[in-house]
UniProtKB/Swiss-Prot annotation:
<comment type="function">
    <text>Catalyzes the final step of fatty acid oxidation in which acetyl-CoA is released and the CoA ester of a fatty acid two carbons shorter is formed.</text>
</comment>
<keyword id="KW-0963">Cytoplasm</keyword>
<dbReference type="InterPro" id="IPR020616">
    <property type="entry name" value="Thiolase_N"/>
</dbReference>
<comment type="pathway">
    <text>Lipid metabolism; fatty acid beta-oxidation.</text>
</comment>
<dbReference type="InterPro" id="IPR012805">
    <property type="entry name" value="FadA"/>
</dbReference>
<feature type="active site" description="Proton acceptor">
    <location>
        <position position="373"/>
    </location>
</feature>
<keyword id="KW-0012">Acyltransferase</keyword>
<protein>
    <recommendedName>
        <fullName>3-ketoacyl-CoA thiolase</fullName>
        <ecNumber>2.3.1.16</ecNumber>
    </recommendedName>
</protein>
<dbReference type="InterPro" id="IPR020615">
    <property type="entry name" value="Thiolase_acyl_enz_int_AS"/>
</dbReference>
<dbReference type="InterPro" id="IPR016039">
    <property type="entry name" value="Thiolase-like"/>
</dbReference>
<dbReference type="InterPro" id="IPR050215">
    <property type="entry name" value="Thiolase-like_sf_Thiolase"/>
</dbReference>
<feature type="active site" description="Proton acceptor">
    <location>
        <position position="343"/>
    </location>
</feature>
<dbReference type="Pfam" id="PF02803">
    <property type="entry name" value="Thiolase_C"/>
</dbReference>
<dbReference type="InterPro" id="IPR002155">
    <property type="entry name" value="Thiolase"/>
</dbReference>
<dbReference type="GO" id="GO:0005737">
    <property type="term" value="C:cytoplasm"/>
</dbReference>
<dbReference type="InterPro" id="IPR020613">
    <property type="entry name" value="Thiolase_CS"/>
</dbReference>
<dbReference type="InterPro" id="IPR020617">
    <property type="entry name" value="Thiolase_C"/>
</dbReference>
Length: 387
């Protein structure tokens, strides 16, 4: 079976969804700029060899509708001969795009793919046009479609306190801020034109949503956002609302080597799994276990882990049940996570994978895991191995 490898991986800065730097920039533009960047950064690649562009996006309507993958690839100048498809596995969409490309490569259905994802949550809100079938109430609780309440449920089941959540959120902002000022995020960010608060055109090079001023004291003053009476989950311990895109160049290993391209990581294994929709945030646990089993590995074999921070109340139970409580500061989300950077739904899977690969290079790590929960009860996971 052929081997799928990551040749390059980049992301946009994360813009604040409410009146942020990308308020006048469309989702197709964020996507196209990254597609163009991958071709610029890898001049050995003949764009005519691109088999398919596979792009994750959740709210596929308005500017994100009518197959945004194709719209963006045409904007980027990718040859018309390349295909393009938009995929939707909710929060796991761009990681699913990676899995689709990897499976195609492994089975000989192409050797060069651009994958990624986007979500402009400022232009197309997360709940825009959502209309659940009434019959779902016979199968799952109505609250299962309310992500904050599922986090409350999962946190309560695992005894996660408000104080633990606040501490986890502070850590996310502190580490993301440190990664910014120390230049570590600069390795993965591709600058995008946006507008400052006065409307002036600027080149955005850093994430807008990180709040370095966040403290335990400031978070303690926030009210519960989803269950006002008995809740513990606040806006401060939830992933920020942000706009962004991420992208990867995925190739068959021998093809990449023949072109003299640097191979940054191999895809060692992949998995998706389902769980109860009422605790959708638990999905990374079964997905991770399945991916590790397929790779013949254990949790202890992993050097670094990126666990998407949908909510602190969701992340901490996953850490607990994967047996990672004692290695959080050595292995997990070393540059912060979605609580600080935001979770543009269709973007995040490739975003956390990009951050992971850069951290693996920085730490000279061999094995890494990227995993995330998915609304309505799923998880997705990818094990990467540095060559």
């Amino acid at each position: 079976m052929k081997q799928a490898v990551i040749v390059d991986c980049i992301r946009t800065p994360m813009g604040r969804s409410k009146a942020g730097v990308f308020r006048n920039v469309r989702a197709e533009t964020l996507s196209a700029e990254l597609m163009k960047a991958l071709m610029v950064r890898n001049p050995q690649l003949d764009p005519n060899d691109i088999e398919d562009v596979i792009w994750g996006c959740v709210q596929q309507t308005l500017e994100q509708g009518f197959n945004i993958a194709r719209n963006a690839s045409l904007l980027a100048g990718i040859p018309k001969t390349a295909g393009a498809v938009t995929v939707n596995r909710l929060c796991g969409s761009s990681m699913d795009a990676l899995h689709q490309a990897a499976r195609a490569i492994m089975t000989g259905q192409g050797d060069t793919f651009i994958i990624g994802g986007v979500e402009h949550m400022g232009h197309v809100p997360m709940n825009h046009g959502v209309d659940f079938h009434p019959g779902l109430a016979n199968r799952v609780a109505k609250a299962s479609g309310m992500m904050g309440l599922t986090a409350e449920m999962l946190g309560k089941m695992h005894g996660i306190t408000r104080e633990q959540q606040d501490a986890f959120a502070v850590r996310s902002h502190q580490r993301a801020h440190a990664a910014t000022i120390e230049g570590r995020f600069a390795k993965e960010i591709w600058g995008i034109e946006g507008h400052d608060a006065n409307g002036a055109l600027i080149k955005v090079m850093t994430d807008e949503v990180i709040r370095p001023e966040t403290t335990l004291e400031s978070l303690a003053g926030l009210r519960p956002a989803f269950d006002p009476v008995n809740g513990t989950v606040t806006a401060g311990t939830s992933s920020a609302l942000s706009d962004g895109a991420s992208a990867m160049l995925v190739m068959e290993e021998s093809k990449a080597r023949a072109l003299g391209l640097t191979i940054r990581a191999r895809i060692r294994s992949m998995a998706v799994a389902g769980c109860d929709a009422a605790i959708m945030g638990y999905g990374p646990v079964p997905a991770t276990k399945k991916a590790l089993a397929r790779a013949g590995l254990s949790v202890a074999d992993l050097d670094l882990i990126e666990l998407n921070e949908a909510f602190a109340a969701q992340s901490l139970p996953c850490v607990k049940d994967l047996g990672l409580q004692d290695v959080v500061d050595e292995k997990i989300n070393l540059n912060g996570g979605a609580i600080a950077l935001g979770h543009p739904l269709g973007c995040s899977g490739a975003r956390i994978s990009t951050t992971l690969i850069n951290l693996m290079e920085e730490k000279d790590a061999t094995l890494g895991l990227a995993t995330m929960c998915i609304g309505l009860g799923q998880g997705i996971a990818t094990v990467f191995e540095r060559v």
